[in-house]
């Protein structure tokens, strides 16, 4: 999973909220993780919450503008999906990826919901994943090539996502769930939250 926050007026800056370059410090919680920190004039609180009874989890980002000018931010989530046995993915993830079917669905409140199904049987099952914004998805992608372009092959670190996401289904060799959340406008001293929710179904 990768979460990228884009914002800070006039800068075009981007930060990864997960991984070694994250501005957050993480600690474990009873049902997930909690990350706290600052990025520029933004105070950030990122939580990962696991559902206690279902195969579901949610990322929630709370932001507060500590500056004296308005700020607009955009949160982008990317999830590398396999929906297959661990051994099969480690053996050839490109092969596994070709059997994933992506279906963008439309929800009147939350915008695009991405449904992903593994068409190659895993035992007797075909795992499915649903991914949605907690607010409203305004754009999506289904392959890493759409998100990072060919630049990702030329560097050890992933480049910033290419926005806006194309909102077009591409079923290539690097299946990815990518959702671009509706921009969040923060007045001076104001706060707001964004995030994404996932549910795994084993049918």
Predicted regions located by residue number:
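Ser/Thr- (and often Asn-) enriched beta-sheet segments in non-cytosolic proteins
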Residues: 25, 43-47, 62-64, 72, ...
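Beta-strand-rich N-terminal accessory domains
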Residues: 1-3
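Residue-level preference for alpha-helix termini and adjacent loops
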Residues: 80-82, 178, 185
